[in-house]
Amino acid sequence: SNEIYYYATGSGNDFLRDIAGASADAPVLINDYIKDLPTVTVQGKTYKFLNGIGYGIDGYCCEVGDRLREQGDSKIDYTGIAIKGLLFHYKPRDAVITVDGINCPYKKVWLAPTMNGRYYGGGMMPTPNQNRLGLNRSLSVMVFFGSSKLKTLAIFLSIFKGEHINHRHNIKVLCGHEI
């Protein structure tokens, strides 16, 4: 059981932001954060994840970002992709979110990330109260649903401060062990 440290490099340090604040000048011991990681199964293959797993417009943004990355070395603006996708390209879907065996149906789901930490996607905070080292080691899913394009855009911008959860008619945060 060696000590494992994380040192921030690059621009997307959502993991570091979650465990040590906005920045860290020194390496951070991460052993506690990488044991018993949650898993996701996609097309029969199981993967562990550190921060979050997306559903909805964030998946669309990753697809567009991957295509742009193949075209050149310019920095990918995921927020810009999300806003353009929301206004012109992405269509919300109806979804059933299952949390610890309880099915919760939602109409017009724009976003539904399952989170181990609080941050992902370049500083978005979909589940501001999520605690990756909480006593029960639960996960959170934030469901953004039922809103028009304009209202979605207005609410979406508040996700970077975690204030979107105040829009209770369109945002639900559910917690559980199996999502």
Model-identified regions with their sequence ranges:
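ATP/nucleoside-binding phosphotransfer catalytic cores, i.e., glycine-rich phosphate-binding loops
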Residues: 101, 133-136, 143-179
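Catalytic core of DAGKc-family lipid kinases
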Residues: 2-110
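Residue-level signature of transmembrane alpha-helix interfaces in integral membrane proteins
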Residues: 24-26, 129-132, 156
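Short, glycine/acidic-enriched capping/hinge loops at junctions between secondary-structure elements
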Residues: 16-17, 63-64, 123-126, 153-154
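Gly/Ser/Thr-rich active-site loops/lids in small-molecule metabolic enzymes
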Residues: 69-78, 117, 121-151
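Short hydrophobic core segments
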Residues: 110-116
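Flexible, active-site-adjacent loop/turn segments at secondary-structure boundaries
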Residues: 13, 53-55, 59, 118, ...
